[in-house]
């Protein structure tokens, strides 16, 4: 898909056009989780041990996207891309804990201009940006989300349609210590190291996901009670989980996310689509649903036709970027993915990849890392996983049809050289179009020195 890119200097009125309202605009419920991997819900993985009965029930009423992706696998740039419809290099929110340039309109304001009351709960934007978004109502409490939404609905003046943006902190670390799963029974993915400590932490992580499921179920029932069939519900996550090769990485474990949409009377129930969509497309789609159009100045586009079953095709390519997270993750990466292949560019492979998990090793987060180091001393397979985690080649290429977990790098395989060159050139052209400066935002950890954990917190 070829898109036009240009600087956005016009106001919101020039950004959004065609504000004609439908006779009965649907209320909107957008439920966002934090660090939830797509493989860790039975919506996508029948072999997972995670129980999500509510999400499975809700999915029978709507459409599940098999190939939904985010713009960047860290909270701040991912959520900035969601709210602006722009990729990180354009918004200025590239590294984690950074914010978009205020000259770029936030797309939920288009809902407000169209008569919607926009209420946000929990973590919708990142950090202090929640207070600067101009929501009509904001409650920052992370606990009791359904109770907070109910109280808001009870006290608001009826009349205007409402958009409820609900941000659940789970399953972001620290994970819960109230276990719903027995660690001894946990099956560990092959790309992680199977230790007692890994299983204990997976049990915590899984328990948080089931907690999310319970909350989503309550929110869904509340929407049905208050809105009848006149609502559209979106469920998704800002990126993959805080595990090695997931969050802060451009493997599918980091960039591919659950996406479920329910829209009674418009979306065929119990359906799935292979259309590739990005988080930058979500708000353009919602604006389209309520009767508005978004200009071509955005990177995002409406996939309303996919929702309505008119097409099963959308994006030909998904571009993703990662630019780092403070002093503990200084490893910029870029990638392009199509329906079958992925090309990854590690911009500075002379440095170690690292992040908060392996450096801090906090309880209920990354404390399993000590057991990994111990296992690697006697187990060559464990040592290979750790080496792959820390040291990356300049380029990676995967055939996702035969290697969906991206374990075999085919960058030097003669059979794929034509496809590799095509995707290499495609990514380079897109980066230039975006104005990507390939910046290092902190001092990296050179592989000529000790591993980051050995240096401690800088």
Model-derived segments and spans:
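Formylglycine-dependent sulfatase
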Residues: 2-4, 19-396, 404-425, 429-432, ...
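C-terminal helical cap and adjacent loop that interface with cofactors, partners, or active-site loops
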Residues: 401
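Hydrophobic h-region of N-terminal signal peptides that target proteins for export
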Residues: 10-19
């Amino acid at each position: 898909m070829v898109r036009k890119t240009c600087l956005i200097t016009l106001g919101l009125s020039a950004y959004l056009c065609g504000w004609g309202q439908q006779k009965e605009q649907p209320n909107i419920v957008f439920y966002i989780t934090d660090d939830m991997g797509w493989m860790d819900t039975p919506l996508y993985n029948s072999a997972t041990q995670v129980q999500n009965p509510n999400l499975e029930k809700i999915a029978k009423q709507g459409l599940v996207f098999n190939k939904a992706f985010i713009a960047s696998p860290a909270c701040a740039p991912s959520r900035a891309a969601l709210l602006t419809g722009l990729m990180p290099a354009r918004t200025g929110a590239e590294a984690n804990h950074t914010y978009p340039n205020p000259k770029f309109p936030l797309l939920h304001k288009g809902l407000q201009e169209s008569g919607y009351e926009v209420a946000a709960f929990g973590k919708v934007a990142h950090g202090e940006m929640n207070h600067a978004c101009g929501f009509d109502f904001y409650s920052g409490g992370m606990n009791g989300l359904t109770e907070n939404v109910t109280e808001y609905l009870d006290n608001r003046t009826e009349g205007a349609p409402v958009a409820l943006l609900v941000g659940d902190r789970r399953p972001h670390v620290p994970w819960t210590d109230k276990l719903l799963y027995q660690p001894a029974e946990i099956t560990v993915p092959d790309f992680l190291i199977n230790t007692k400590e890994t299983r204990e932490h997976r049990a915590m992580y899984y328990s948080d996901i089931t907690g999310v499921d319970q909350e989503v179920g309550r929110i869904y029932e509340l929407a049905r009670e208050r809105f009848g069939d006149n609502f559209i519900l979106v469920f998704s996550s800002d990126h993959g989980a805080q595990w090695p090769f997931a969050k802060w990485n451009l493997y599918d474990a980091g960039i591919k996310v659950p996406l479920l949409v329910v829209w009674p009377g418009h979306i065929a129930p119990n359906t799935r689509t292979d259309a590739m969509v990005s988080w930058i497309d979500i708000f353009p789609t919602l604006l389209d649903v309520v009767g508005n159009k978004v200009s071509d100045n955005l990177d995002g586009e409406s996939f309303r036709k996919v929702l309505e079953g008119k097409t099963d095709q959308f994006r030909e390519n998904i571009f993703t970027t990662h630019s780092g997270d403070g002093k503990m993750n200084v490893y910029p990466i870029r990638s392009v993915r199509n329906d079958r292949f992925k090309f990854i560019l590690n911009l500075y492979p002379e440095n170690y990849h690292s992040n908060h998990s392996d450096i801090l090793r906090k309880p209920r987060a990354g404390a399993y890392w000590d057991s990994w180091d111990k296992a690697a001393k006697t187990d060559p397979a464990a040592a290979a996983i750790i080496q792959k985690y820390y040291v990356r080649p300049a380029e990676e290429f995967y055939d996702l049809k035969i290697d969906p977990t991206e374990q075999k790098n085919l960058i030097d395989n003669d059979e794929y050289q034509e496809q590799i060159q095509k995707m290499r050139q495609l990514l380079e052209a897109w980066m230039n179009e975006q104005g990507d400066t390939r910046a290092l935002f902190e001092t990296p950890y050179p592989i000529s020195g000790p591993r980051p954990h050995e240096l401690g917190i800088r």
